[in-house]
């Protein structure tokens, strides 16, 4: 079994790993960690929600939260990383997006437009 490992961003970039979770009691949480190409910690945070519609919604909220976090830190070149392939798929369909996540994804796009460059992987 292959153990997942963290891959650093390019020199001059930051990487923000984020995740969302739903719990059996119906609550949810999001979190994000920002590191540079050396793995040096540049910030992180977690947010609790009194509700959780579903796991994909929490992943989308985590992405939104991560973009806000890096902007607060003054970052301009950021790679965002998630383990949620469904979110990556929805993000790449941006112009065709009509799901219940469309509003959140558009907000993320608007928030990220002030960054020099960012990507999702």
Which functions belong to the PLM regions below?
Residues 1-121:
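Primary recognition of RNase H-like, Mg2+-dependent phosphodiesterase/nuclease domains
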């Amino acid at each position: 079994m292959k153990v997942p490992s963290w891959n650093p961003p390019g020199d001059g970039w930051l990487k923000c790993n984020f995740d969302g979770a739903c719990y059996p009691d119906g609550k949810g949480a999001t979190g994000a960690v920002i590191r540079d190409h050396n793995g040096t910690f540049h910030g992180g945070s977690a947010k609790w929600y009194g509700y959780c519609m579903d796991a994909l919604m929490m992943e989308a909220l985590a992405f939104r939260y991560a973009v806000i976090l890096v902007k607060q830190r003054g970052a301009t070149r950021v790679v965002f990383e998630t383990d949620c392939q469904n979110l990556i798929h929805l993000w790449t369909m941006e112009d065709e997006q009509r799901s219940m996540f469309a509003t959140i994804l558009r907000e993320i796009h608007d928030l990220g437009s002030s960054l020099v460059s960012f990507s999702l992987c």
